[in-house]
Amino acid sequence: MPAPACNGFRIPLTRRSLAHPIFKPRASSKKTESSCAADDRTSQRPRIRTGVSSSIHNAAMTAVPDSRIRVLRDEPPRHGGRYVLYWMIAARRLEDNFALQHAADWARQLDLPLLIFEPLRVGYQWASDRLHAFVLRGMVENRAAARELGVTYHAYVEPAPGAGKGLLERLAREAAVVVTDDYPAFFLPRMLAAAATRLDCRLEAVDSNGIVPMRATTTVYPTARGFRRYLQKELLSHLGQFPVSSPLQFAEHRPAAIDDDVRRRWPEATDEVLAATPDALSRLPIDHAVEPSPTIDGGPRAAHARLAHFLEHGLPIYHEARNQPDSDASSGLSPWLHFGHISVHRIFSEVMTQAGWTTRRLAPKPTGAREGWWGAPESVEAFLDELITWRELGFNFAANRPDYDQYESLPPWARASLEAHASD
């Protein structure tokens, strides 16, 4: 059975759970506890989304915040579409995923099955056995979980550069709506822009990257302190807008039909390929000199195991020992965050639940300081500054600066520092 709807703190959304202490407002808030509970209940109900598109202004949707949704191609849902297509490219997980939640809600509203399409190309920069194996192990878990719930999942691993060309368009031809992940870096922005011109149906990109939506502001912050002050002003409202823990419970649990010609031309990845066996990897045109990691496995299961290890062993000493390589104090979660196998919302909720934290502990005013604002133990505040401030500063920059990867995009103080040490 799927897990119950969850607010991100592993707390089932029931009338009783809405009084959980982690959701109690800080003392200075003008809202009462009961009003906050009502807000939380409302956020889990289907609602009317307005202001996104005149063509679907009356579509009832669940509470994926508007600030997380970009309409890349504004069309009404295709009449006669056979399914809703979720094109999984960044948030490669079936839990705590705003994009999957949004796609599942579309499927429910249109009374259509959901088709999850997770591709892996070979032509990306630095493609290697190590990176491929990491992603493939996550795909194995995603396929098994989707099948258990009766949701159609199509894993496609490109055997040669360009072999997957046309597959997205072919799947989208039968889709009422296409939902995908919004991600501001690498080749993904170009890929989404190209898809918006090639597809002939509604295309929406949904941001699951951070606690605060990366496009909630168009201001680019050149310093962590400035961004931290912005976060401290905005975070409280976003802490009540976590993704549903198990969004597939809301999808139509019936198969989505994929045409035979699609399966013949773009066959689903075999068990051998998804297992990332040496033979399977050797047949792919990727860098075989960079072998799979012998100690780090991809996938949500390994991500959650690493998080559990960190909570027990690393977090208590994080503020003192995170920069000491032999201490095992760092979280080690970066690979799974990078490939979308675990969400920042889940990490935050596990950390704060262990700390016994509630929003009542927040400082009444933003300070921009690294310590003291959360009202949490020193080790927790140090970790949150890395997990939220520094990580989401990068998303803010990349989302608002198309030239984020160019030297000229660096703020003057950073360029001055680099130039001063050019001869080091």
Positions of predicted regions on the chain:
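Low-acidity, Ser/Thr- and Arg-rich intrinsically disordered low-complexity segments
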Residues: C6, R10-S17, F23-C36, R41-R49, ...
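Generic detector of low-complexity/intrinsically disordered segments
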Residues: I11, R15, H20, P25, ...
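Trp/Phe/Arg-rich N-terminal binding region typifying the photolyase-homology
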Residues: H57-P247
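Terminal low-complexity, poorly structured segments
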Residues: A5, F9, T14, A19, ...
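Glycine/tryptophan-enriched, flexible segments
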Residues: H79-G80, V220-W413
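Short, intrinsically disordered, charge-balanced linker/junction segments flanking boundaries
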Residues: H421-D424
